[in-house]
Amino acid sequence: MYLQNANESLVVVLTAAKDTLDCSIVCDINDHDASGMITPQVAAQASTNGTTEVTITTGGADKNRQVARLTLYNNDTDIINAVFSKKISGTLYGIVKVQLQPGATAVYSKDGA
């Protein structure tokens, strides 16, 4: 997935209140400009905030941002449901909804692995 400018972002929200702990998020990012991929690669870390939307990463004004890998770990003691969306100028475009048992991890990779 690419975020093509500063008006595009990747967001997550839980569909119900957490029991005790928010989920951990790690997002590995490849940035690209007119010359190609910018190195070194970067990572963004975040935590869910209950039923409040959380921005994981946002595109740049002069670069494309590629989400290379994304993990969501359920730190909670109960099952969680999380919805990931691409947000463009305030409009949400649903990507995926995942349900995780306590201690489980959801993984997205641009390579499909």
Residue ranges: model-predicted function:
Residues 1-113:
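Surface-exposed, low-hydrophobicity beta-strand/loop segments enriched in small/polar/acidic residues
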